Each structure stands twice: as structure tokens, then as C-alpha cells.
A protein has these predicted regions:
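RNA-interacting cores
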Residues: 1-258
Length: 258
């Protein structure tokens, strides 16, 4: 199950919004963990927490978006109790203006979401809200490839949804054979982390799919999953947040995470 939570936060006076403040928020979250939970999360290959900051909806405000997977579910009660959040990078505490918890999301709910993908769609648009990157042979990849995107989603699914893993390597290869990046609008963007700058990218890519029906169903499942899991590295620290919408010519049909 996935627990999707959003907190509207009021920034201290004269404090500017920065996406990398999400790293400090994750630090505040870790500070409240029990030693047992902290050890459990750090032992995971992929941290079962994905979070990022989104600006607005009003000046001086931002929205903290979190997705908690089963191993981190107990954090929901901690987050719900917060009224202020102290961050070392801010001159005063952030005020919690609103807390919203959405209905838990199961595998079956993701399958149903994938089945609502519009048949008239010609592609899927990935909008990278926060800097995204991949680690390849010890270096950061400054541009996404189809293989890197699919491998990231595949690995995250298997780590975060262990009761319904994708074990067929041939299926991954077949999926990749029918996908291609058909358009992109990206720019370089660093993410500040522990005094370092992680090179990445933001913007959008459009991915077209020509797949047999079973593979198309799998692709749509991964599209439904991606906004909750994130893509690339350090998604628990605020990187790799993505929104996905169908590309439908001469139409404004919306298919977004709720």
C-alpha cells in the first residue's frame, strides 16, 4: 500500500522557496524516527519514502508531497501531529497550514488507474518537477534514456511492492523494444545536497509506445506507479519527482495523480 500525503507549509518571512529544502525536511523526518524504524529504512535497497517540495499554491507557501510505502507507514502518525517544522536552513520554523492524507493506494488501484489511460493517447509526457539523474558506471547521467527510465521504475516496483514483483527479464526487454523518446524539453539543474551539487535535469520528455496488449497494460501500470515512486536516484531526498499525463492531440484530457 502507498500512503500519499500533502502538507501545505508557510515559509518564514523573507525565506525563499527552494526545491532542495526537501532534503532538510527529510532530515527532520529522520530525527523523529525510532531507532528500530531508522535501521529498517536504512537497510532497504530503496528507501520506502518518496518526497519533494512544490511551490505555492500562494506566495510564501509550498506543498510538501510524500509517499510512504508499507515499511514506512508508521511515519504517517508522526507527520500528522506536526504543527511546525524546524529546519536548520531556515531562520524560523515552517508552519503547517493544512494536512491532507489520501486513501491508501493498492496494487489493484494502480492497475485500475492504468486501465483508465485514454486509448486515443499518442504518448506519455513525463514532467520532471525536481532535478532527476541516474548513476551510471559511477557518474551522473545528464540526459534520460528509455533504458534508464524503465530500469528505474522496474527496480523501484520490485523493491517497494514486494508482494507483486516483476520477475520476467524478457518482459522488460520486450517493453523497452516498443518504447521510444519522441520529444523532449529539458534543462540542466543541480540539486544541493550535503554541501554538494548533484547534476541533474528538469523539464519534460514524451514517450511513445507501440506494444502488444499485455505489454501495454504493464506500461500503463508503471505510468500509474511512477508519480508515487519517483524516478532516478535520491528520491527520498527530494529528487526525481515526476508527473505523467497522456498526450492527446487537439484535446485537453487530464490523467493525473490524485
Amino acid at each position: 500500500m502507498i500512503r500519499h500525503i500533502e502538507l501545505r507549509l508557510l515559509l518564514p518571512e523573507k525565506e525563499s522557496f527552494r526545491t532542495d529544502m526537501a532534503y532538510a525536511l527529510y532530515g527532520a523526518l529522520c530525527h523523529c524516527m525510532t531507532p528500530v524504524l531508522a535501521d529498517t529504512l536504512h537497510a532497504q535497497k530503496i528507501t520506502p519514502v518518496r518526497q519533494h517540495l512544490r511551490s505555492g499554491p500562494e506566495p510564501g507557501q509550498c506543498t510538501w508531497v510524500l509517499d510512504l510505502f508499507d515499511a514506512a507507514a508508521e511515519l504517517e502518525n508522526t507527520i500528522r501531529s506536526w504543527r511546525t517544522i524546524d529546519l536548520q536552513c531556515c531562520s524560523a520554523p515552517l508552519q503547517v497550514m493544512q494536512y491532507t492524507a489520501f486513501a491508501p493506494i493498492s496494487v489493484s488501484a494502480l492497475l485500475e488507474k492504468g486501465q483508465t489511460w485514454p486509448p486515443a493517447s499518442t504518448a506519455a509526457e513525463f514532467l520532471f518537477e525536481t532535478p532527476c539523474t541516474f548513476k551510471v558506471a559511477g557518474s551522473y547521467a545528464l540526459f534520460p534514456s528509455m533504458e534508464l527510465i524503465v530500469q528505474s521504475l522496474w527496480m523501484r516496483w520490485n523493491a517497494l511492492m514486494p508482494d507483486c514483483t516483476l520477475e520476467d527479464a524478457d518482459a522488460q526487454h520486450l517493453l523497452l523494444s516498443g518504447l521510444r523518446i519522441c520529444r523532449y524539453r529539458l534543462s540542466s539543474r543541480d540539486y544541493k545536497l550535503k554541501g554538494q551539487r548533484i547534476p541533474g535535469f528538469v523539464g519534460s520528455v514524451q514517450i511513445s509506445a507501440r506494444l502488444p496488449a499485455p505489454m501495454m497494460e504493464l506500461w500503463h501500470l508503471l505510468l500509474a506507479f511512477a508519480p508515487y515512486s519517483g524516478i532516478g536516484i535520491k528520491t527520498a531526498l527530494g529528487m526525481g519527482a515526476v508527473r505523467i499525463t497522456p498526450v492527446i492531440r487537439k484535446s485537453n484530457v487530464s490523467w493525473q495523480q490524485k
